[in-house]
């Protein structure tokens, strides 16, 4: 049978797909956003939409308001529910869309359902367990839909960049636990509550040792399998995430800068994610 492409959308705006999780659970619809440039680097879309691949009909699932933009949407693996990036409402010159100034939004597609903010944000001390201090990005569900992975950047570290003794902001990987809401203070106008308890599951270093597992940056995360994997000792790791980790390779370039490369790493998630480990949850 010859291969044949079939166009299923036609409109005067962009149609951008996330690189995973765009199909509805029943395999009839594809979800997308409407950012204006093909590369998706300009975050200016205001709609989350879905197209029915059977007849080409298009439905607007969500439209952002008050100057906010939205995009990078993925579908729940077995429910009529989506999650996507949402920029700040009422943006200002000092608080507009950016890597550390965005959040996840979950939308149940049942009639009458209201969108809910995924991740709480607390920008003032004392910090709150389960709340982030910045922005989440590219949200993907685990195979059973019980967890949501995302990448994360810290707004407070962005603001303090260059301060002696303060680590710089570096992208990391986090996980949200739906159904465990987090409430924060109203001491900062951009604080907000979230429907999920969030934790950062990677660790980055300000100065990484060459040829070590010290990480400078984490990105491009992906859930492993539908039920994790079995490790070398025969132990089932039911929840695990693979990601790209940036590491130094021990040589300098022509500008005298330490060269780095991205390696593949795996993080095995504990059964109780909301329990503090070597670092606090706040």
For every predicted segment, state its role.
Residues 1-282:
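Sequence signature of WD/YWTD-type beta-propeller architectures
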